[in-house]
C-alpha cells in the first residue's frame, strides 16, 4: 500500500505560487515512482489552469472540486497507471476521456506514448483540442466519436497496445469494447474503486467468451484522500501461449 501524504495541502497554493505548486506535485508523483522534469511539471500546471478556465464554461469536472481534488483525484490518479504501461512508446486509446483523464497526464509523463482520446461530447473535444495546442502535445489524436461507432468501422480498429478508461462504464461493457480495440499482445486496463470484486464477479462468466483473462490486480491508496484504487489488467487469452 502506498504511503499517504497527509501533510500535503494543495489548496494553499492555488495559482499564487507556481514554483511551490510544481514542487509539491513533483513530490506527490514521486510517491508513485513517477519522476517529472521541470517541463513536464509546467505542463501539468498549464493543464490545471486550462481545466479551471474551461470548466467555468463547460462541465469537465465537478465545479466544487478544490485544487487538492483536481491534483489528487485527476492528475495523480491518472499517473498511477504508469507502472502498468507495458509499452511506453506504444499506442494507447482512452475511451470516454472527458477532461483528458487518464490519457493526457500519461502523455505528459510518457512523451513517446502515442495517444488517441475518444470523446463523444463536442464541447469536451473543443477543450481537448485547445489543450493539445496549448501544451504542444505531439502524437495525440482526438476523436469526436462514440466507442460503439468506432468498433463497427471496417476494418475493425484492432490496433491499440493499451486500452484505458476512467469513464463510468460497467466492466462487462468496457471489456466488450476493449476486446475489439486491443491488439493481440496488448492490455485492457480498468480503473476501479473499492467494489471492484463485485464487478469482477459480473464478468467471470464472459471472460472466456471474450477471449480475455485477468492477468493482474494492483491496489493502492491515493495520497491525502486515502481513496482506494484497484487497477485491473486484462490480456487476450492467446497471449498466455
Swiss-Prot record:
It catalyses: guanosine(527) in 16S rRNA + S-adenosyl-L-methionine = N(7)-methylguanosine(527) in 16S rRNA + S-adenosyl-L-homocysteine. The keyword Thylakoid does not apply. The keyword Transferase applies. S-adenosyl-L-methionine binds at residues 96, 101, 119-121, 147-148, 166. Its EC number is 2.1.1.170. GO terms for molecular function: rRNA (guanine-N7-)-methyltransferase activity. Its main location: cytoplasm. GO terms for cellular component: cytosol. Specifically methylates the N7 position of guanine in position 527 of 16S rRNA. Belongs to the methyltransferase superfamily. RNA methyltransferase RsmG family. This is Ribosomal RNA small subunit methyltransferase G. It comes from Syntrophus aciditrophicus (strain SB). The gene is rsmG.
